Amino acid sequence: MNSHNITNESLALALMLVVVAILISHKEKLALEKDILWSVGRAIIQLIIVGYVLKYIFSVDDASLTLLMVLFICFNAAWNAQKRSKYIAKAFISSFIAITVGAGITLAVLILSGSIEFIPMQVIPIAGMIAGNAMVAVGLCYNNLGQRVISEQQQIQEKLSLGATPKQASAILIRDSIRAALIPTVDSAKTVGLVSLPGMMSGLIFAGIDPVKAIKYQIMVTFMLLSTASLSTIIACYLTYRKFYNSRHQLVVTQLKKK
């Protein structure tokens, strides 16, 4: 295995890449200098904290701490997903249920099949990958669902007036929203290895692992990303479409205003 380590000095020199981005922003008057500095500073602090937390959890190797960390990851993913729901109020609970269930089922299958072991060194990184992907998919699902409901209010009202239930009136919108949310994950699976070398595969190869073995892990990652994204978006969409209707099965127009 490759024993090369990144020193603090080399990391400081790599910071020059950020300076390049800042210079481009300044030259082109993009006004992103503060955002770049803030995002980089925040990323450094967050990663340092997470690094020490993970080091402690890995050394303790406690099942309850591992589960707690997985729930914390799902909590943060749900919190960020609901912030992207521009047209849906109070979507955190739905997001948390969707992402936690999707990630939980996927992790359970991976552990029971022997693909990974229930140890923090394997469970936590995998949970981070699938929860992050589910977060993006659920956010896209919310946005698409809200936009479609707003643009098709008249058609929905007509269906309701003809006796359709909210589920029947929203069926096409739900299907299209789930489909739109899954397209990035599906497209990524189509081009994996051809357009880009994904994170896990690149990391393993960089660490000196045999590329063929790294590919097996990446195939597993592709499977789990598709599974979690599908489960999470379906659950999220079916939990949130009801928010556009009241107890009398009427479309709540006031709730459709963009926040």
UniProtKB/Swiss-Prot annotation:
<feature type="transmembrane region" description="Helical">
    <location>
        <begin position="6"/>
        <end position="26"/>
    </location>
</feature>
<feature type="topological domain" description="Periplasmic">
    <location>
        <begin position="213"/>
        <end position="218"/>
    </location>
</feature>
<feature type="transmembrane region" description="Helical">
    <location>
        <begin position="57"/>
        <end position="77"/>
    </location>
</feature>
<feature type="topological domain" description="Periplasmic">
    <location>
        <begin position="1"/>
        <end position="5"/>
    </location>
</feature>
<keyword id="KW-0812">Transmembrane</keyword>
<feature type="topological domain" description="Periplasmic">
    <location>
        <begin position="113"/>
        <end position="117"/>
    </location>
</feature>
<keyword id="KW-0472">Membrane</keyword>
<dbReference type="Pfam" id="PF03649">
    <property type="entry name" value="UPF0014"/>
</dbReference>
<dbReference type="GO" id="GO:0006826">
    <property type="term" value="P:iron ion transport"/>
</dbReference>
<feature type="transmembrane region" description="Helical">
    <location>
        <begin position="118"/>
        <end position="138"/>
    </location>
</feature>
<feature type="transmembrane region" description="Helical">
    <location>
        <begin position="36"/>
        <end position="56"/>
    </location>
</feature>
<keyword id="KW-1133">Transmembrane helix</keyword>
<feature type="topological domain" description="Cytoplasmic">
    <location>
        <begin position="78"/>
        <end position="91"/>
    </location>
</feature>
<comment type="function">
    <text>Part of the ABC transporter complex FetAB, which is probably involved in iron export and enhances resistance to H(2)O(2)-mediated oxidative stress. Probably responsible for the translocation of the substrate across the membrane.</text>
</comment>
<feature type="transmembrane region" description="Helical">
    <location>
        <begin position="219"/>
        <end position="239"/>
    </location>
</feature>
<feature type="transmembrane region" description="Helical">
    <location>
        <begin position="92"/>
        <end position="112"/>
    </location>
</feature>
<protein>
    <recommendedName>
        <fullName>Probable iron export permease protein FetB</fullName>
    </recommendedName>
</protein>
<keyword id="KW-0410">Iron transport</keyword>
<dbReference type="GO" id="GO:0006879">
    <property type="term" value="P:intracellular iron ion homeostasis"/>
</dbReference>
<comment type="subunit">
    <text>The complex is composed of two ATP-binding proteins (FetA) and two transmembrane proteins (FetB).</text>
</comment>
<feature type="transmembrane region" description="Helical">
    <location>
        <begin position="192"/>
        <end position="212"/>
    </location>
</feature>
<keyword id="KW-0813">Transport</keyword>
<keyword id="KW-0997">Cell inner membrane</keyword>
<feature type="topological domain" description="Cytoplasmic">
    <location>
        <begin position="139"/>
        <end position="191"/>
    </location>
</feature>
<dbReference type="GO" id="GO:0005886">
    <property type="term" value="C:plasma membrane"/>
</dbReference>
<dbReference type="InterPro" id="IPR005226">
    <property type="entry name" value="UPF0014_fam"/>
</dbReference>
<feature type="topological domain" description="Cytoplasmic">
    <location>
        <begin position="240"/>
        <end position="259"/>
    </location>
</feature>
<keyword id="KW-0408">Iron</keyword>
<keyword id="KW-0406">Ion transport</keyword>
<dbReference type="InterPro" id="IPR056728">
    <property type="entry name" value="FetB"/>
</dbReference>
<comment type="similarity">
    <text>Belongs to the UPF0014 family.</text>
</comment>
<keyword id="KW-1003">Cell membrane</keyword>
<feature type="topological domain" description="Cytoplasmic">
    <location>
        <begin position="27"/>
        <end position="35"/>
    </location>
</feature>
